[in-house]
């Protein structure tokens, strides 16, 4: 999702390879636009040379600013009418003023908004009615008076200092969303208004004693985690004084309307009933406000422990599953031990579901740098008896087998067709009838590693990447984040008090793998 991938046809590449190598990145819009979209090639589009650089013609610059091109299908779910938050924690460098930091941040986000027009727009819903959830689209939005929202809590006695956060490895309990965010996150919907437009891209900078906490926000109807971290990557590049490479701009500004085809009349739609739930309303929210005393926690798995875990989970694999990933092994461990902590409340034949958010880019043949929503869900079911008695390798194999079977272009196209044909999409969620008492909902960006820890110019490299502590609990939620550039994994989870106590105080096997941060 952040790896730079681009290619040019052989003839053009051979003619310009030396020039291209010398100028791999430059200012926005000094690049080749989508040469291959809709059959375009260097032979049938106009490109110009200026100072040895490939530059888009005015025609293609105009296309990038046509906001209709960013209309998609997978981003149409009302459950995505929320802001996704990612916190980056930095120590404040010596001899660097706040004014310099804020100036660089402001210029960087302005540069990104200019280079990727939909990131400078806002999300609106049109055509909503009693029987339809309407259409989410981006619309023009005047630039904000200030590019970023700034808070100074360095003298706030109720706010932790950076040293305190670092000593405790930034537990989520110390990252209150009320202090470090300006708008709520999932699952609370954000409503566009004249006073506070639902801008696609937002940024909050909060100074604390000895440090800075930056909240990077993106509107979820317009981007998944790939797009979110793609925008952060571009801001970091701008703060380092770098321009944006051709391939990155191509994918960031890619036309979404024909990204992939929906099912045709002779193609059978799969059964997506598991994604249906009653409409989400204020009286019937996505998550019950009476969740069983659940809280959010951060758990760390070191790079060494992850290697050992994968080796253990790879012993005795089913013959039809020749390979499992580190995420498979970690998912199996969490699913098994969460179930062990819950088992006293349920019978052995109780069914548990592991709902896994999956990036569909590879299955669809889409670049990792594409920034729109391409997430779908793969659910795997086992009974409590199976989860508590099966060895880790068998559970990991079961997860991998289902992922291989369902993470296909056909499955994703079918899900998109299902969304497109459903007028009221408020009945559709990734988890469907998710039971927080028995199920686990998992997503992962663990594999990004160094990509999530770039240098931000004068700020340097962040020491922690976190989510803020939400105001709404979502029991059963599980997220894998890179804990460090060296390969550690920080797991962000939400469990009941009795469950987390069982894991961290009574489950000796769990404790040998995981370090509790808080």
Predicted regions and their residues:
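Short strand->helix junction
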Residues: 95, 221-222
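Acyl-CoA-dependent O-acyltransferases
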Residues: 2-130, 298, 305-518
């Amino acid at each position: 999702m952040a790896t730079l991938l681009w290619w040019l046809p052989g003839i053009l590449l051979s003619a310009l390879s030396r020039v291209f190598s010398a100028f791999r990145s430059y200012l926005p819009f000094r690049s080749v636009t989508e040469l291959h979209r809709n059959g375009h090639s260097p032979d049938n589009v106009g490109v110009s040379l200026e100072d040895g650089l490939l530059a888009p013609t005015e025609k293609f610059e105009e296309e990038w600013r046509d906001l209709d091109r960013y209309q998609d299908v997978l981003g149409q779910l009302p459950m995505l009418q929320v802001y996704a938050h990612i916190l980056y924690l930095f120590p404040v460098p010596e001899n660097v003023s706040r004014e310099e930091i804020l100036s660089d941040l402001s210029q960087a986000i302005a540069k990104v908004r200019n280079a990727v027009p939909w990131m400078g727009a806002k999300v609106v819903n049109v055509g909503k009615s009693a029987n339809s959830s309407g259409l989410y689209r981006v619309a023009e939005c005047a630039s904000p008076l200030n590019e970023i929202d700034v808070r100074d809590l360095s003298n706030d006695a109720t706010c932790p200092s950076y040293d305190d956060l670092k000593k405790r490895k930034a537990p989520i309990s110390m990252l209150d969303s009320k202090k470090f965010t300006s708008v709520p996150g999932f699952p609370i919907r954000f409503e566009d208004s004249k006073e506070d437009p639902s801008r696609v891209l937002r940024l909050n900078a909060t100074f604390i004693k000895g440090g800075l906490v930056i909240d990077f926000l993106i509107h979820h109807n317009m981007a998944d985690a790939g797009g979110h971290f793609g925008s952060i990557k571009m801001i970091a590049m701008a703060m380092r004084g770098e321009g944006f490479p051709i391939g990155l701009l191509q994918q960031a500004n890619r036309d979404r309307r024909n990204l992939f085809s929906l099912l045709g009349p002779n193609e059978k739609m799969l059964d997506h009933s598991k994604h249906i739930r009653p409409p989400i309303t204020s009286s019937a929210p996505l998550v019950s406000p009476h969740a069983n005393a659940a809280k959010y926690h951060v758990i760390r798995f070191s790079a060494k422990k992850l290697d050992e875990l994968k080796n253990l989970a790879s012993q005795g694999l089913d013959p039809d599953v020749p390979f499992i990933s580190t995420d498979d092994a970690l998912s199996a461990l969490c699913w098994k031990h969460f179930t062990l902590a819950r088992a006293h409340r349920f019978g052995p034949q109780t069914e548990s579901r592991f709902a896994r958010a999956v990036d569909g880019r590879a299955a669809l043949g889409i670049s990792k740098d594409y920034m729109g929503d391409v997430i779908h869900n793969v659910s795997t079911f086992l009974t409590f008896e199976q989860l508590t008695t099966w060895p880790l390798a068998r559970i990991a194999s079961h997860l991998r087998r289902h992922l291989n079977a369902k993470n296909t272009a056909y499955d994703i196209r079918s899900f998109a067709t299902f969304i497109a044909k459903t007028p009221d999409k408020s009945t559709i969620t990734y988890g469907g009838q998710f039971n927080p008492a028995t199920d686990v909902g998992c997503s992962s960006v663990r594999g990004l590693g160094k990509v999530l820890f770039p240098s931000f110019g004068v700020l340097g490299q962040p020491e922690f990447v976190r989510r803020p502590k939400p105001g709404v609990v979502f029991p059963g939620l599980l997220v894998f984040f890179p804990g460090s550039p060296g390969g550690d994994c920080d797991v962000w989870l939400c469990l009941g008090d009795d469950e987390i106590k069982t894991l961290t105080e009574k489950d000796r096997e769990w404790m040998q793998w995981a370090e509790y941060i808080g």
